[in-house]
Amino acid sequence: MAKITKEQFIESLKEMTIKEVMELVDALKEEFGVDPSAVAVAATPVATEEVKTEVKLTLKAAGQQKVAVIKVVKDLLGLSLMDAKKLVDAAPSVLKEAIKPEEAEEYKAKLVAAGAEVSID
């Protein structure tokens, strides 16, 4: 029997009727003992981690440099000095909710540089 190429095989499939293709599939199952449904289940991609579009920035603690943290909170959130101090003193406290992850990372970097302990949820 002459060996055929993949392209020739595909061209032959294109010329077949649905019934002929079904018969071919059944014959392949029988010949090789393969169950296509088992392969399809195994080929199903694993669920990917959900990407968050909005996060919450929380100040956990002000750290040793409380004054520096108060200044950063004041500048980032546009608060008065007293409001920023109250927010920092009340730690752990939510600084911003429903913000983009990139923005939260930027805020976190500035707060950590000032000595704060921050989390993004």
Curated annotation (Swiss-Prot):
Q: Which UniProt keywords apply?
A: Ribonucleoprotein, Ribosomal protein
Subunit structure comment from the entry: Homodimer. Part of the ribosomal stalk of the 50S ribosomal subunit. Forms a multimeric L10(L12)X complex, where L10 forms an elongated spine to which 2 to 4 L12 dimers bind in a sequential fashion. Binds GTP-bound translation factors.
- Entry's HAMAP family? Ribosomal_bL12
Q: What is the lineage of its organism?
A: Bacteria, Bacillati, Mycoplasmatota, Mycoplasmoidales, Metamycoplasmataceae
What is the gene called?
A: rplL
Name the record gives this protein:
Large ribosomal subunit protein bL12
Gene Ontology biological process terms from the UniProt entry: translation
Q: Which GO terms describe its cellular component?
A: cytosolic large ribosomal subunit
Described purpose of this protein according to its UniProt entry: Forms part of the ribosomal stalk which helps the ribosome interact with GTP-bound translation factors. Is thus essential for accurate translation.
Q: Which InterPro entries match?
A: Ribosomal_bL12, Ribosomal_bL12_C, Ribosomal_bL12_C/ClpS-like, Ribosomal_bL12_oligo, Ribosomal_bL12_oligo_N_sf
- Could you tell me which Pfam families the record lists for this protein? Ribosomal_L12, Ribosomal_L12_N
Q: Does the keyword Ribonucleoprotein apply?
A: yes
Q: Which family does it belong to?
A: Belongs to the bacterial ribosomal protein bL12 family.
What organism, scientifically named, is this protein from?
A: Mesomycoplasma hyopneumoniae (strain 7448) (Mycoplasma hyopneumoniae)
Give GO MF terms, alphabetically. Answer: mRNA binding; structural constituent of ribosome
The answer to keyword Ribosomal protein applying to this record is yes
